[in-house]
Amino acid sequence: MAEPFHSQTGAHNRPMESLIVDTGLYLDILKISDAEELFALVEENRLYLRKTLPWLDEVRSLDEQISYISHCQTDYENGKGVMYAIRNGGRIVGTVGLNWLDFENKSCGVGYWISEHQTGQGIVTRSCSRLIDHCFNDLNLHRFVLEASVENVASCNVADRLGMRLEGVN
C-alpha cells in the first residue's frame, strides 16, 4: 500500500499538526478532545453560521461533533485532507482546513469559519495566509482553491486580501 502523503518527487510530506500564525494565534489539528469546546462554539454561533455553511445541520449534538472530528482524522491519516482548530489565545475561535488534497495535481481546497465575535480582526486572512505558505512551501502544492459561498462577502474579501482570483463559480 502506498504511503498516503507524498509528492511527485517522492518526498513524504504531511500537513503539519500545528502551525504558528503569529503571537497567540495558531492552527492545531482537530482532536476528539476538542469536540466539547468546538461544539459549544458551533452552538453559540449557529444562527450566524447558518447563513453560509450548508454542513451546519449535520452537527446537532456532541456525538455528531465527535463523529465529524473522527472523519477529519481519518481523512488526515489517509492523505485526503486536514482540519485545524483556529486558536486565538489558546481558545478555539473557528476552523480552517484542507477539505481535499490532490497531490497528483498538486492542488487543495480550503474552507473555514470563525465565530461572529472574532470577525473583523484578520484572523481568517492570517490563518489562510499561513496555511497557503505551508501548502506551497512544505507540501509542494501549486493550486489553492477557496471553497466559499459567493454570497459570503467576508469570505470574498478574504480571497481578495490573499490575492486570489475568481476563476469560476460552482
Give short role names for the model-derived ranges.
Residues 1-37, 41-48, 83-170:
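Acyl-donor (CoA/ACP) binding surface of acyl/acetyltransferases
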Residues 67-71, 130-133:
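Generic recognition of well-ordered alpha-helical segments
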Residues 50-70:
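Conserved GNAT-fold acetyl-CoA-binding loop/helix
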Residues 74-79:
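Short loop/turn motifs at secondary-structure junctions and domain boundaries
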Residues 43-46, 57, 73:
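Residue-level detector of secondary-structure transition/capping positions
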